[in-house]
Curated annotation (Swiss-Prot):
Species whose genome carries this gene: Bacteroides thetaiotaomicron (strain ATCC 29148 / DSM 2079 / JCM 5827 / CCUG 10774 / NCTC 10582 / VPI-5482 / E50)
CDD domains associated with the record: L-fucose_isomerase
Cofactor (UniProt): Mn(2+)
Keyword field: Carbohydrate metabolism, Cytoplasm, Fucose metabolism, Isomerase, Manganese, Metal-binding
EC numbers: 5.3.1.25
Gene Ontology MF annotations: arabinose isomerase activity; L-fucose isomerase activity; manganese ion binding
Pfam families from the UniProt entry: Fucose_iso_C (PF02952), Fucose_iso_N1 (PF07881), Fucose_iso_N2 (PF07882)
Active site: residue positions: 338 (proton acceptor), 362 (proton acceptor)
Protein name as annotated: L-fucose isomerase
GO cellular component: cytoplasm
Length: 591
């Protein structure tokens, strides 16, 4: 089991001894226990373990008890806090003052004791001290002996906890750049100030010659390599596609392709070891290499220097981003193609919020209904009727994105790893063809994964962009994968690279200018790449972004569903403008 941060639960109480405090002790502690149970029963970490909550040893009525609670939370590895109360408490004495913890306060809506009054008072204190907190207040009054958590309160607690756990999990980890800037792509000009100040992360970097050194000096688990090759032969190499993209003089011979398979399998093992380390290497005498870089996310430059000379990174990237490999079902890694760290961060956000594999894609083409009709003679229908966006990547997309995993009703899904079945794994592998890489672009060869995503999956496309003078901003577009007429797909796909994986995406339209039509979504997208997560997670992303002080510049989430710190209300009634002003005022957490 990995070690994850915990969520601290702070039961606060009216400190007046002699009747008041005593009458509230049991009620207040029961609320804290209910919150802890709600979180642990509903939220999991990436390895499937329940998110653990730590409750203060006793209720908090005066500042000494606040300090004792803070000391315990530091000792126990807490990364965020939720304060709960059913009554009046002393605001500045009982509040959480840790500047790095995301924090929320639930004030019980009851008439016997003024929990709502404390909530308002302590939130004013948080705003005044520059320590934004999320206020949680139930819509309906509850009786004093009712310790159940209303549905609206539970939703906010879980939304906060999900995002707060993501913030805490990132803190102290690394982003590993394997290589440097790819083809001048701005997202791969990695900005260490952003990672340090906004995410609390380090930046690690290796030259790609390190991969070759480990290959040539045998610095990898040779037993695992044999196992990996046997698995690859059985499930991937058997699905090697026809080499139709390359001219005869550029096609590699069979023995060269066999060598490429061996090469890319070693690449994957080494890239994983670089990210997270491998105790097996210590047994082999490579103590330094065994450590890894403590990377929660990484990027692989590939183009051009590597791919002009060596097999490309499509196979290792695709499988690292997938929820399984030769060692079985596991948590997906986060690896950004072309070392686009901005997209890698968006993938990391999606992964930490959902525990699912993330799709990395070029946001390649908007196809209008008129253009499709002109090119194919056929019309788009259903969800695709207003046009589609072609999401496609150079063969390095997670195999989970094929949509071959099915839920109980037979619908395509991308599952958390603990819900994946062996049948799901085999279906994803069977649906994936590994085409020899197009050597006009990838001179060194390699193999690109190819599949067509199943339609009907709810997904969220997102992107982090860095803007000079402004800082980071986040874009969010909820929508669906769609299936189109096979003849339409064939003709459109042949106009790009048919050896690469395709996802046809339709955003949910609304009255916001960037979402008035599908074209506007494409036209307002801030970069060439997007990260795509299963599910409509825009609400969670907005909550997470507010914790990190990253304004959201584009989204199609219902404004009534947005949950940000209460202090954001002081920055005006226009939610987007208030978000920008609040993020600018408070600045990054770790600066």
């Amino acid at each position: 089991m990995k070690k994850y941060p915990k969520i601290g639960i702070r039961p606060t109480i009216d400190g007046r001894q002699g009747g008041v405090r005593e009458s509230l002790e049991e009620k207040t502690m029961n609320l804290a226990k209910a919150v802890a149970e709600l979180i642990s029963n509903n939220l999991k970490n990436g390895d499937g373990s329940p998110v653990e909550c730590i409750i203060a040893d006793n209720t908090i009525g005066r500042v000494a008890e606040s300090a004792a609670c803070a000391e315990k939370f530091e000792r126990e590895g807490v990364g965020s806090t939720i304060t709960v109360t059913s009554c009046w408490c002393y605001g500045a004495e009982t509040m959480d003052m840790n500047p790095h913890y995301p924090k929320a306060v639930w004030g019980f809506n009851g008439t016997e004791r003024p929990g709502a009054v404390y909530l308002a008072a302590v939130l004013a204190g948080h705003a005044q001290k520059g320590l934004p907190a999320f206020g949680i207040y139930g819509r309906d009054v509850q009786d004093l002996d009712d310790n159940t958590i209303p549905e609206d309160v539970a939703e906010k607690i879980l939304r906060f906890a999900r995002a707060a756990q993501a913030v805490a999990t990132m803190r102290g980890k690394s982003y590993l750049s394997m290589g440097s800037v790819s083809m001048g792509i701005a997202g791969s000009i990695v900005n260490p100030d952003f990672f340090q100040e906004y995410l609390g992360m380090r930046n690690e970097s290796i030259d790609l010659t390190e991969i070759i050194r480990r290959m040539e000096e045998g610095i990898y688990d040779h037993e695992e390599y044999a196992k990996a090759m046997a698995w690859t032969e059985k499930y991937c190499k058997v699905n090697e596609g026809e080499d139709f993209k390359n001219r005869p003089e550029k096609r590699k011979k069979r023995e060269q392709k066999d060598a490429d398979w061996e090469f890319v399998v070693k690449m994957m093992i080494i890239m994983r070891d670089l990210m997270t380390g491998n105790p097996k290497l210590k047994e082999m005498g490579f103590k330094e290499e065994a450590l890894g870089h403590n990377a929660i996310a990484a990027g692989f430059q590939g183009q051009r220097q590597w791919t002009d000379f060596y097999p490309n990174g499509d196979y290792p990237e695709a499988l690292l981003n997938t929820s399984f490999d030769w060692n079985g079902i596991r948590e997906a890694f986060v690896v950004a193609t072309e070392n686009d760290a901005c997209n890698g961060v968006a993938m990391l956000f999606g992964h930490l919020l959902t525990n699912r594999a993330q799709i990395f894609s070029d946001v390649r083409t908007y196809w209008s209904p008129e253009a499709v009709k002109r090119v194919t003679g056929k019309e788009l229908t259903g969800l695709a009727a207003n046009g589609i966006i072609h999401l496609i990547n150079s063969g390095a997309t997670t195999l989970d994105g094929s949509g071959q995993s099915l839920d109980a009703e037979g619908n395509p899904v991308m599952k958390e790893p603990w819900n994946l079945t062996d049948a799901d794994v085999e279906n994803c592998l069977k649906a994936t063809t590994w085409y020899p890489a197009d050597r006009d672009y990838f001179r060194g060869g390699g193999f690109s994964s190819n599949f067509l995503s199943k339609g009907g999956m709810p997904v969220t496309m997102m992107r982090l962009n860095l803007i000079k003078g402004l800082g980071p901003v986040l874009q969010i577009a909820e929508g669906w994968t769609v299936e189109i007429d096979p003849e339409i797909h064939q003709k459109l796909n042949m106009r790009t690279d048919p050896t690469w994986p395709t996802t046809w995406f339709v955003p949910r339209l609304c009255d916001k200018s960037a979402f008035k039509d599908v074209y506007s979504v494409m036209n307002n997208w801030g970069a060439n790449h997007g990260a795509i997560s299963y599910g409509h997670i825009g609400q969670d992303l907005i909550t997470l972004a507010s914790m990190l002080r990253i304004p959201v510049c584009m989204h199609n989430v219902d404004e009534n569903e947005i949950f940000r710190p209460t202090a954001w209300n002081a920055f005006g009634m226009d939610k987007e403008g208030a978000d920008y002003r609040a993020c600018t005022t408070y600045g990054p957490i770790y600066k």
